[in-house]
């Protein structure tokens, strides 16, 4: 084996070791021993109750108890930070724990920035939906379709806030499943917009197909071990199909509908915002990570497409309200 090949292998192994250190904090013996000793010393047999001698040490707030921080959870949280500091002392990269970066807990919330931004997204969608209902007649084209997307979004943001508050298997499932429902609904709205002149029967069949697919996918996520990689691929593929569909639509109507530029702008900005999800860095001040920034970026995007709805209404082009529901 040549020295160049050997050097390449050494560099590759070094990169792999670094990657492991950066993502496997919960697999270190240090973390494992710390957690074992903590639970044996401070917790009840089931790991739920804090022993009397440790109550003053943990000093749980009303929010910690409300969000069900058990003694075992407190041990995991404390040992997580002890492990992080141990990595710091050795000059190693900040590790992840169970696939997540370490976050400072605030008022019982595991990821406070993502919770706040999810709630802000919910508030913005709710406020703009109410404004839409005041200004658009119920018999307007795509009135119901816009409501379907809005309600789907509101539900998704509720579960996003709940999941980032406390990460349980159930809250994780509902967050991922309902987040995908928003993306799938975007694709559904695009298809319905393309077929708005076709028969009600055809649109009904397609609606049932979308519903059946989503129920089946929800059931798939609910059974067995959660497949994060597959779920991400499905989300990206669905989003790309919806975006491509709108780009094709914009291309064909560019001479007849000048507002198509707003739709293009929305999807370009959405793509830029989604690129934040590709970044992966330790939380700034242990609170703000790339995922939280993605949630922050979607707040003005919601206002952007509802703003376009208002402009179209003032122009008496009611039929395109549904376009902005994606």
Swiss-Prot record:
Involved in the lipid remodeling steps of GPI-anchor maturation. It is found in: Golgi apparatus membrane. Belongs to the PGAP3 family. Keywords: Glycoprotein, Golgi apparatus, GPI-anchor biosynthesis, Membrane, Signal, Transmembrane, Transmembrane helix. GO terms for biological process: GPI anchor biosynthetic process; GPI anchor metabolic process. It comes from the Eukaryota. Residues 127-142, 193-203, 254-267, 326 are cytoplasmic. Pfam families: Per1 (PF04080). The chain crosses the membrane at residues 106-126, 143-163, 172-192, 204-224, 233-253, 268-288, 303-325. It is a multi-pass membrane protein. Glycans are attached at residue 42. Residues 23-105, 164-171, 225-232, 289-302 are lumenal. One of its GO terms (molecular function) is hydrolase activity, acting on ester bonds. Residues 1-22 form the signal peptide. GO terms for cellular component: endoplasmic reticulum membrane; Golgi membrane. Disulfide bonds: none annotated. InterPro entries: Per1-like. This is Post-GPI attachment to proteins factor 3.
């Amino acid at each position: 084996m040549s020295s160049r090949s050997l050097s390449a292998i050494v560099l590759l192994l070094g990169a792999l070791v670094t990657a492991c250190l950066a993502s496997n904090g919960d697999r270190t013996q240090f973390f494992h021993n710390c957690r074992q000793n903590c639970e044996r010393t401070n917790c009840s047999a089931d790991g739920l109750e804090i022993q009397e001698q440790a109550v003053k040490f943990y000093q749980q707030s009303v929010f910690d108890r409300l969000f069900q921080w058990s003694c075992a959870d407190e041990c995991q949280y404390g040992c997580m930070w002890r492990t992080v500091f141990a990595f710091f002392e050795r000059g190693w990269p900040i590790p992840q724990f169970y696939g997540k970066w370490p976050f400072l807990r605030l008022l019982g919330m595991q990821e406070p920035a993502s919770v706040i931004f999810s709630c802000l997204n919910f508030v913005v969608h709710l406020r703009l939906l109410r404004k839409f209902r005041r200004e658009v007649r119920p018999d307007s084209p795509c009135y119901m379709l816009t409501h379907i997307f809005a309600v789907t979004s509101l539900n998704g943001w509720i579960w996003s806030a709940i999941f980032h508050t406390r990460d349980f298997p159930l809250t994780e499932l509902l967050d991922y499943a309902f987040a995908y429902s928003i993306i799938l609904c975007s694709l559904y709205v695009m298809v319905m917009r393309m077929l708005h002149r076709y028969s009600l029967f055809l649109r009904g069949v397609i609606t049932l197909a979308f519903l059946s697919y989503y129920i089946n996918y929800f059931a798939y996520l609910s059974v067995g071990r959660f497949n994060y990689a597959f779920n991400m691929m499905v989300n990206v593929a669905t989003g790309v199909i919806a975006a491509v569909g709108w780009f094709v639509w914009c291309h064909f109507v560019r001479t007849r509908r000048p507002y198509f530029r707003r739709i293009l702008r929305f999807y370009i900005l959405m793509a830029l915002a989604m690129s934040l999800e590709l970044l992966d860095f330790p939380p700034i001040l242990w609170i703000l990570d790339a995922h939280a920034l993605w949630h922050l970026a979607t707040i003005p995007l919601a206002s952007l497409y509802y703003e376009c709805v208002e402009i179209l209404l003032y122009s008496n082009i009611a039929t395109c309200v549904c376009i902005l529901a994606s």
